[in-house]
Design a protein with these regions (language model features):
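Active-site His/acidic residue clusters
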Residues: 255-271, 317
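Active-site cores of enzymes that catalyze phosphoryl transfer or operate on phosphate-rich substrates
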Residues: 247-250, 269-274
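Bacterial Sec-dependent N-terminal signal peptides
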Residues: 1-24
């Protein structure tokens, strides 16, 4: 059952909170609205052959935590805890010069990775990735080389993974994998719209290339879910849809909102909060493009298959003649970077996806480990950054259906910018006996009071509500190696006064209600 209709009370809230100010934070349930069962693929992740994400991250045969396949078991255990549903691989920019055939079989060919300008040993290839996914319990999502690769190379890769016949199906069997991998999710290219990408394409080139690649890939696996690199810019995505839309299931959108490519000067907490509305604006622009192209109402869905607040730090200053500053990539590992700002921005991003979950079907946090990842891997174990616990809460605490709500909220201002101080979504189980309301307080120092719509939920008002809260002593708190975690979800009971609940500053809170 993917969609159902529920009648709600249309009674408006008449009371205000104690000590109310001229404007209140008020949550209302939208009457007579359809509830949507969202796709938990929204809680997906991404991994790239960049720096220490794969080698020394999820894969390290020399580690004391390695299993018989060289996979870090502590990483696998942590990912199982947040029930990772899908992982996109191998890139990213890396894939635009990656030729998959060098990464299969007993004899591996080390290659020079022209995208990141290092050697890749190719010891972690297609078969290893899929085996790792099976251990984690997630779906493999393979992004193909549409930079220096060809449509035929892409379809050969599908053949290797999914067939038992032909040259490449037989090659997989000979490599020790008699059963097909049955990879369902495939993307044509990565960011081929950008001048930074090796093998970048023009608008005129991209649509025909995607069309022909998709035709070949579907000739191998007819029911494959196909993606293509797109943007929320109409000038790129509209021509793509006109040429190849009929072959696609998803447009692939990427987003990073704190650009740190060249200079590792992370935005402050309040600056980050001013960016929290940007992802939803991108989603709405993309939806408008899909509708104008005739692919609205879910005919083609949105996959935000790379996203994070902060972009990866890898200085090259726009000039390939200067190369990369390789040692500067270590700055991505600094624990103090990943504060409540990262956690709350990520929660706001997930809320935006869930509000539009009839169209936004998949999202992949970038990356899954190391660099800006939710988990930092080191020789003695792992560190769960603040963003890890956001996924822990969303995956394990939310119910399965989105209940449409409105949120009247006071503004939070900084310089010439402003955003709503609160962001919230409501989820329910199938028969509306359990509710989980997610609310984010973006204010760095002040508590906020929220009026809850008990009447709209057909619930009796209560004096107490159970909650799980993620916060810190300050907005700049972070978790670090060898110390007690400062930012970790805590279960508590909150008081409810005149239908209102008080939320801690810089916090992510999940409130639980039952009939």
């Amino acid at each position: 059952m993917n969609m159902k209709t529920k009648l709600f009370s249309t009674a408006l809230l008449l009371g205000f909170c104690m000590n109310a100010i001229a404007q209140d934070n008020i949550m209302d349930v939208v009457p007579n609205a359809k509830e949507i069962k969202y796709n938990k693929m929204i809680f997906g992740h991404f991994i790239e052959h960049f720096d220490n994400q794969v080698y020394g991250g999820l894969y390290d045969p020399t580690s004391k935590f390695a299993d018989e396949d060289g996979f870090r078991t502590d990483v696998i255990e942590a990912l199982r805890q947040i029930q990772v549903p899908i992982v996109r691989w191998p890139g990213g920019c890396f894939v635009s010069t990656y030729h998959w055939i060098y990464g299969v079989g007993k004899e591996r060919t080390p290659v020079y990775d022209k995208s990141w300008q290092v050697e890749d040993p190719n010891t972690f290839g297609t078969d290893e990735f899929i085996k790792w996914c099976r251990k984690v319990g997630c779906e493999p999502f393979i992004c193909t080389n549409a930079g220096t690769g060809t449509p035929e190379e892409m379809s050969d890769w599908v053949e290797y993974c999914n067939l038992n016949i032909g040259k490449f199906g037989r090659m997989r069997i000979a490599n020790g994998y008699p059963k097909p991998h049955n990879v369902k999710y495939w993307s044509v290219g990565n960011e081929n719209w950008g001048a930074h990408e090796l093998g970048a394409r023009t608008v005129q080139e991209w649509g025909p290339l995607v069309r022909e690649s998709a035709k070949l890939m579907r000739s191998v696996t007819k029911d494959a879910k196909l993606f293509a690199a797109a943007t929320s810019n109409k000038n790129w995505t509209m021509p793509l849809l006109r040429e190849a839309g009929y072959q696609l299931d998803y447009v692939s959108i990427h987003g990073y909102w704190d650009p740190l490519f060249h200079y590792n000067n992370p935005a402050s907490f309040i600056e980050c909060m001013m960016k929290t509305d940007a992802p939803e604006k991108d989603i709405l622009r993309t939806i408008a493009i899909l509708e104008e192209a005739g692919f609205g109402n879910g005919k083609i869905k949105i996959a935000y298959d790379e996203w994070n607040m902060r972009n990866w730090h890898h200085p090259w200053h726009g000039d390939f003649r200067k190369g990369f500053e390789l040692e500067a990539r270590r700055k991505n590992d600094i624990p103090s970077t990943y504060t409540m700002a990262d956690a709350l921005f990520s929660a706001c991003f997930l809320n935006a996806c869930l509000r539009h979950s009839d169209i936004v079907d998949i999202a992949c946090f970038s990356p899954i480990v190391n660099t800006r990842g939710a988990i930092f891997v080191h020789p003695e174990g792992i560190l769960k950054r603040t963003t890890y616990y956001v996924f822990d809460m969303y995956v394990n605490l939310l119910e399965d259906y989105m209940v449409p709500t409105t949120l009247q909220t006071v503004p939070l201002k900084h310089a010439d910018k402003q955003t709503g101080v609160l962001d919230g979504i409501l989820t329910s189980n199938e028969n509306n006996t359990k509710y989980a309301y997610v609310v984010i307080n973006k204010d760095p120092t002040e508590k906020q009071t929220l009026k809850l719509d008990f009447q709209g939920l057909n619930l009796k008002s209560t004096k107490k509500v159970k909650a799980t809260v993620l916060s810190g002593k300050t907005a700049d708190d972070y978790n670090e190696i060898g110390a007690e975690e400062r930012v970790v979800p805590k279960e508590m009971t909150l008081s409810v006064k005149e239908g209102c609940v008080t939320l801690p500053p810089h916090s992510l809170t999940v409130l639980f209600f039952e009939k």
